[in-house]
């Protein structure tokens, strides 16, 4: 049981570390929101240089939050695998004892004992199948959270949308996500009206 106990202690330590990383992630999220609020207040005071600095801080906190979250996710995946390994080790030891009991039953010709042993044997096999399936699912779902390309630009655009910074502080807009202007919307409406008029004229 020494190795199993050691493994369980390691699993406990990893779980503790993962929770600590998640707390750090939540802390960074709160700090990010605080920086965004500073951006808003700086704009209200006309302090665009300060607003830019606070916006950069918000982006940095967002990046830190994702890094902590990514590490926590990877640790959780490792813990799931180790936890499965520990359970499989315990089951394997139980199987060894059952095999010995089955051999004893066969040697003595005790049918009742043999039947009881086979019940235990089959139950352990079911447990092993469940654990194996759990491990496969854990491995399939253990891909780390990756920050999508353009994550920073998207967050900067969010700050811009919330506080009207897209022009005043020159924040870049992610490709393909430019906000349509009122003029563009008006042109689209005029074009649609023109096409409808043409269709009516043809009718």
UniProtKB/Swiss-Prot annotation:
Membrane topology type: Peripheral membrane protein
Transmembrane segments: none
Record region (Disordered): 172-203
Annotated coiled-coil segments of the chain: 13-51, 109-140
Keyword Mitochondrion annotated: no
Traits of the deletion mutant: No visible phenotype under normal growth conditions, but double mutants chmp1a and chmp1b show embryo development defect.
Main location: cytoplasm
An annotated GO cellular component: mitochondrion
Keywords: Coiled coil, Cytoplasm, Endosome, Membrane, Protein transport, Transport
Compartment annotation: Cytoplasm; Endosome membrane
GO BP, sorted A to Z: embryo development ending in seed dormancy; embryonic axis specification; endosome transport via multivesicular body sorting pathway; protein transport; seedling development; vacuolar transport
InterPro entries hit by this protein: Snf7_fam
Bias type Basic and acidic residues, positions: 192-203
Role this protein plays: Involved in ESCRT-dependent multivesicular body (MVB) formation and sorting of endosomal cargo proteins into MVBs. Mediates the MVB sorting of the auxin carriers PIN1, PIN2 and AUX1. Required for embryonic axis establishment and seedling growth. Required for autophagic degradation of plastid proteins. Promotes the efficient sequestration of cargo from plastids into autophagosomes. Mediates the efficient delivery of autophagic plastid bodies to the vacuole, but not into the cytoplasm.
Subunit structure: Interacts with CHMP1A and LIP5. Interacts with VPS2.2.
Similarity comment text for this entry: Belongs to the SNF7 family.
PANTHER family per the UniProt record, alphabetical: CHARGED MULTIVESICULAR BODY PROTEIN
Record protein name field: ESCRT-related protein CHMP1B
Organism: Arabidopsis thaliana
Classification lineage: Eukaryota, Viridiplantae, Streptophyta, Embryophyta, Tracheophyta
Gene designation: CHMP1B
